[in-house]
Amino acid sequence: MHVLRTHLAGDLGKETAGQTVTLTGWVSRRRDHGGVIFIDLRDSSGLVQVVFRENDVAEQAHHLRSEFCIKVTGEVEARPEGSENPNLASGAIEVNVTDLEILNEAAPLPFQIDDVSQGGEVGEETRLKYRYLDLRRPNQGAALRLRSQANKAARNVLDSHDFVEIETPTLTRSTPEGARDFLVPARLKPGSWYALPQSPQLFKQLLMVAGMERYYQIARCYRDEDFRADRQPEFTQLDIEMSFVDQDDVIALAEEIVSSLWKLIGYEIPTPIPRMTYADAMRLYGSDKPDLRFDIKIVECTDFFKNTTFRVFQNEYVGAVVMDGGASQPRRQLDAWQEWAKQRGAKGLAYILVGENGELTGPVSKNITDEERAGIAAHVGAKPGDCIFFAAGETKSSRALLGAARNEIAKKLDLIKEGDWAFTWVVDAPLFEPSSDATASGDVALGHSKWTAVHHAFTSPKPEWLDSFDENPGEATAYAYDIVCNGNEIGGGSIRIHRRDVQERVFKVMGITEDEAREKFGFLLDAFAFGAPPHGGIAFGWDRIVSLLGGFSSIRDVIAFPKSGGGVDPLTDAPAPIPLEQRRETGVDFKPKKKTDESAV
């Protein structure tokens, strides 16, 4: 239904020639050709060229500037032969304007908004400060429309399987889930605080106890994390939970959803999507989210060098990756690799160059034995002209360095082609990890022991570990699954714990006392006592998925009003101080009374 206009710009074509139309929109570009004025008029559907030839209306059009909001009436005409624009949907026609109304003028722009200038030269702070202008750019507006299409596609799949869309609270109590909470003061209960949810995890499990069986929600989530590249303090996930299912059931549904999303951009995902274990992902790719668009694998060399005299390789782990044709790199490039490794916390990146005649050169080749020199190229699959990069030391960090090196090699060799997609599931991750590893990576280690949950505290052990996970926490595997696309984790889930005794044992491994468990998670433990069904689910990182679908380099491009670095909103200048009166009213400075006896608060 159109009130001020009869058509959208994108609706006009040769079939509308001869019709009188009324359009509304913004002046995208203005060109003056000998008294005839051409305007590219933009609305939400696209662009159309409108022409001002008549004296009065042309005189009025002389006052138009970029981003004036206008209304025009005129006749649709075929463009003169040779002046068609094949790059424009409406490029075969133009509108000969007979009436012009300026709905609103525009001040001088902080940056240009047109089809040619798409934002690369404009600083991000400026773009976000004037986000309402930035979103007028075709690419930016298209990102939000793509997001809406993705929402619809996912809902269609879930609705076809009888899922129920349910909203869960955004004001709840603080229940640690692996990051810091955003807290909201409770004005009516001074000294008490709500927390914004890091995820709907506990509520969706309670919905399974409630018998809803199939739930989903496009949920807003909040995590008060130290700023990391391309993270947002508030983000969106497609949250799903199902009762009476196993891992295969959840994965099958997830693949149906992902397939429907990639069909939006014309790509058919081959299903079933391959699976690999977490152990294989770390061993072969040095990452639990491997990019499989190129076939470079890490080769284990620990056993090969088990009797080495080279002290650097006398370590718990030695591994290698091969750079095809890398022996031809100049010395400055090999030195640059060392700086690259040091920036990642390593001492360097050892290497061997395999000459065209098979002769080995480079620092490592001088320090290994003749037997090792004779066999290393064959062991790692290197041929004449290749470069072998090594990492040695602690297993996890060495593999991570080699994993990063394989990604860097792929970039330098241009192995990743536009339009390539590679999906995999990573399954059988550890149930627990050392708390020190979690904190070192910037996460919050839930609990007070040397072990914390890898995913979250509500992930079930795999069936074979159900009776013994607390006897050997470091070896226990989780009934969990992550989906990876082009080296990005786009979703993760697990089969959940549904028995109170198992949940209490997990808390115990993590050093959460009975009293603390009762205080923070008592409502969940109580619910498990009332016939909680087996259940599992998955959550998709919606911002990341839409950015991949649209080919955007940052999730900020697919969020209507994102935060910049450090969680700051340049548009509204949030976060901001609040007045003293508001501080008093909300009770943020309330100080609990000191305890005078056991019952005092």
Swiss-Prot record:
Its EC number is 6.1.1.23. It catalyses: tRNA(Asx) + L-aspartate + ATP = L-aspartyl-tRNA(Asx) + AMP + diphosphate. Residues 201-204 are annotated as: Aspartate. One of its GO terms (biological process) is aspartyl-tRNA aminoacylation. One of its GO terms (cellular component) is cytoplasm. Residues 581-601 have a biased composition (Basic and acidic residues). It is an enzyme of class 6 (ligase). SUPFAM superfamilies: Class II aaRS and biotin synthetases, GAD domain-like, Nucleic acid-binding proteins. Residues 568-601 are annotated as: Disordered. It comes from the Bacteria. InterPro entries: Aa-tRNA-synt_II, aa-tRNA-synth_II, aa-tRNA-synth_II/BPL/LPL, Asp-tRNA-ligase_1, Asp-tRNA-ligase_1_N, Asp/Asn-tRNA-synth_IIb, AspRS_core, GAD-like_sf. It is found in: Cytoplasm. Its main location: cytoplasm. The keyword Acetylation does not apply. Keywords: Aminoacyl-tRNA synthetase, ATP-binding, Cytoplasm, Ligase, Nucleotide-binding, Protein biosynthesis. GO terms for molecular function: aspartate-tRNA ligase activity; aspartate-tRNA(Asn) ligase activity; ATP binding; nucleic acid binding. Signal peptide: none annotated. Homodimer. Aspartyl-tRNA synthetase with relaxed tRNA specificity since it is able to aspartylate not only its cognate tRNA(Asp) but also tRNA(Asn). Reaction proceeds in two steps: L-aspartate is first activated by ATP to form Asp-AMP and then transferred to the acceptor end of tRNA(Asp/Asn). Belongs to the class-II aminoacyl-tRNA synthetase family. Type 1 subfamily. NCBIfam families: aspS_bact, PRK00476.1. This is Aspartate--tRNA(Asp/Asn) ligase. It comes from Corynebacterium diphtheriae (strain ATCC 700971 / NCTC 13129 / Biotype gravis). The lineage of its organism: Bacteria, Bacillati, Actinomycetota, Actinomycetes, Mycobacteriales.
